[in-house]
Amino acid sequence: MTEPIEVLYFYRTKWGAHDEFMRLFRKNHWPILREQVGEGRFTDVHLATPRFHGDGRADWDIVVSITYRDWASIEEHSEAEIARRLFPDQDAYKAEEQRRFELLDAHWDVPVERRPLE
């Protein structure tokens, strides 16, 4: 399949950890995602958070949508190489990434298929 594939990455941060998670995401993960947009692996990346608390279920508080060029680009694994290039201090980078995931209660990925309404 050669059409773009959208995957939603849901995150639920622990109570009080949202700001720290976002800081670490912007510092360490966003540069890697941005690099992959520049390389053409991704055609779009955006992040969203709920504007309001809603009904209180709080299944997620952050969602990142990544549109991959195609199915083949999902199989490409260039994150580690990009991380080594962008973050020469790998010990600090890995510690901060571990901390970022310690701030989560849950994380899951959902490939979605857009459907025409007419």
Could you say what each language-model-derived stretch is?
Residues P4-R12, V63-V64:
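Active-site-flanking beta-strand signature of metal-NTP-handling nucleotidyl enzymes
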Residues D19-R23, R69-E81:
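Short amphipathic alpha-helices within nucleic acid-binding modules
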Residues I32-L33, I82-P88:
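A common structural junction motif
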Residues A58, V64-R69:
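Aromatic/basic micro-patches that form nucleic-acid/chromatin recognition or nuclease catalytic surfaces
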